[in-house]
Regions:
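Histidine-centered divalent-metal-coordination microenvironment in nucleic-acid enzymes
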Residues: 57, 171-184, 353-360
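Loop-rich catalytic cores of soluble enzymes, especially ATP-dependent carboxylate-amine ligases
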Residues: 40, 154-165, 173, 182-347, ...
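A glycine-rich phosphate-binding loop feature that marks nucleotide/adenosyl-phosphate handling sites
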Residues: 133-135, 233-237, 396-407, 454-464
């Protein structure tokens, strides 16, 4: 059964889709058999194999709340080779990565342990609580991450030099959280068989993952509405550039109804991406678009120059230096061989998992992520997977982009309308409809795990639709007012969280695990640095060959 987007109702399904849920007759799904199959307790158990992981970025700041000028602490290991503690763009921008796990509780628990361990190694520095930085100076004051003398390390550094050259370094100090998600291998044969899908299982898997991604691009605006937590920022972040933001207090600007300035045009965006023909309509179109973008020269970037003698300013003057520069709310991922480009790994082996990139850091929580976020994400992603997902046209992509922009800049505005098939409809109605559509999938997950955690999370989060004051973005605005500025609020949260994390004990086993991993990474870094290296120019050419 083909299905429309939100805002239109289907005729009653003639089959018994999911015998416990008559509401599924209104779902926009492709095959009733899929839902019936996975509603049975025995089949629902396969969903306990869903694999999850978090990546959390956060700035190190000094005791005055300024961007830390110190190098990455040696006590945190090699930022190039440590599996869980690394850096993103800036030397002061930490990134904590949880190993993938099918235990739903593991990512949050492990992320908490990373924070506890790291907070103890920072001395008088703090982990900045918010997504938006504060009190940052000119680009020259923002040091990019330094990874060592090897060609691998230099490649990462030049890439970051290029990002700063193209977009400015201030934008690279914004922090967020990514959610990595995949279905177990045992899930796919069952789904393929009840869908009469392709004989090649990887082709079927790729097609369904890309269908999930397209639906997430349609409905992902619900994430910043429910969880956005960056409605205000320090005036210093704009570095004198004009904006439509209003003054909330001296030194603090905000959008009165904003949910996530991090996801707005002020945040991390790649406007050159508008020139790229990168489509999510199939794996082939997606990888073909990426390949074209890393080989298409851009006059603006060419004018910046790639090299000054031996100094590399960027990896290339193409639309993208590497595939990682492509910005999207969700990306298909595949762990390839060492040195293998992401697009080639996807082409050769197919989609392994998806990376959802829309979570702001919740400044009220010491690890920046609330427990209900993964429960909601599981349910939304499962619904996006099962739901019919036609190709996205350029017109619809414009709608999707506009809806996201409206939600991140004024999502709590009373009466806000979003676009559905060129018609405006109330955000609240569309959000309630999405929650209706997700309810059976929450029940499916609850059947798998034997409790009501998913239904309870959806019920609680649904209240934020009619009561926007319950959203983190609204609560941040109120907290900023109480503290007098965004800086005062974020600094208070940063100090409080760091002190709390330092006071919480790690088990001897966990402490030993981290200590061993630190030493292993430093030893591996020393070995890499000692190896002879060839020409960096040849190294870069080999990567793109």
């Amino acid at each position: 059964m083909c299905a429309p987007r939100l805002g239109r109702k289907l005729p009653h399904c003639s089959r018994t889709c999911f015998r416990h849920y008559d509401t599924l007759a209104m779902l926009k799904f492709t095959c009733c058999n899929q839902l019936r199959q996975f509603s049975e307790p025995a089949q629902a158990q396969v969903l306990t194999g869903i694999v999850r992981g978090f990546e959390r970025e956060c700035l190190r700041v000094d005791h005055d709340g300024l961007l830390a000028k110190t190098p990455h602490p040696n006590a945190l290991g090699s930022k190039l080779l440590h599996p869980w503690i690394t850096t993103d763009y800036a030397e002061a921008l930490l990134e904590f990565i949880t190993p993938p796990s099918s235990d739903p509780a593991f990512p949050m628990a492990f992320l908490k342990d990373i924070h506890r361990f790291s907070a103890r190694q920072l001395g008088s520095e703090y982990l900045w609580a918010g997504s938006m930085p504060c009190k940052i100076g000119p680009d020259a004051d923002i040091a990019i991450a330094h990874y060592g003398p090897s060609n691998t390390a230099r490649f990462k550094e030049v890439y970051r030099e290029g990002l700063g050259l193209r977009y400015g370094r201030a934008m690279q100090t914004i922090a967020g959280a990514h959610y990595n998600w995949s279905l177990p291998e045992a899930f796919w044969p069952v789904m393929r068989d009840c869908c009469n899908g392709e004989s090649n299982l990887q082709d079927f898997t790729n097609r369904r993952y890309f269908g999930l991604i397209r639906n997430f691009l349609r409905f992902g605006w619900l994430i910043p509405y429910l969880f956005g937590a960056s409605p205000a920022l320090c005036k210093s972040f704009l570095q004198g550039k004009p904006s439509d933001l209003r003054e909330l207090s001296p030194g603090t600007l905000h959008g009165p109804y904003a949910t996530s300035l991090r996801m707005s045009d002020l945040g991390y965006q790649n406007h050159a991406q508008d020139q790229m023909a990168i489509s999510f309509n199939s794996l082939q179109e997606y990888t073909r678009g990426l390949e074209a973008a890393i080989r298409t020269h851009d006059p603006y970037y060419a004018d910046m120059g790639v090299r000054d003698g031996e100094h590399w300013k960027q990896l290339s003057d193409c639309l993208l230096q590497t595939e990682s520069e492509f910005y999207a709310a969700m990306r298909p991922k595949r762990i390839g061989l060492h040195g293998e480009r992401p697009a080639l790994a996807l082409q050769r082996y197919g989609v392994q998992y998806v990376e959802m990139r829309l979570f702001d850091l919740n400044p009220f929580i010491d690890i920046g992520i609330a427990p209900e976020q993964s429960l909601f994400a599981d349910t939304l992603l499962l619904m996006c997977l099962f739901r019919d997902s036609p190709p996205i046209t350029s017109r619809e992509q414009g709608e999707n982009d506009e809806n996201k922009l409206r939600v991140v800049t004024r999502g709590r505005q009373p009466g806000l309308q979003l676009l559905v098939h060129n018609r405006e409809q109330p955000l609240r109605s569309l959000a309630h409809e999405l929650f209706d559509d997700m309810a059976p999938f929450a029940a499916m997950l609850d059947a798998a795990y034997g409790d009501q955690r998913y239904a309870t999370a959806l019920r609680d989060l649904r209240q934020r639709i009619g009561e926007p004051d319950r959203t983190p973005s609204a609560q941040v605005i109120e907290a900023v007012k109480q503290h007098g500025s965004y800086f005062n609020f974020a600094m208070e949260m940063s100090k409080s969280h760091s002190q709390k994390l330092q006071a919480e004990a790690l088990s001897q086993e966990t402490q030993a695990q981290f200590t061993a991993s630190i030493q292993t990474s430093l030893h591996a870094q020393a070995e890499l640095d000692a190896q002879p290296k060839g020409s960096f120019e040849d190294f870069v050419a080999g990567y793109f060959a």
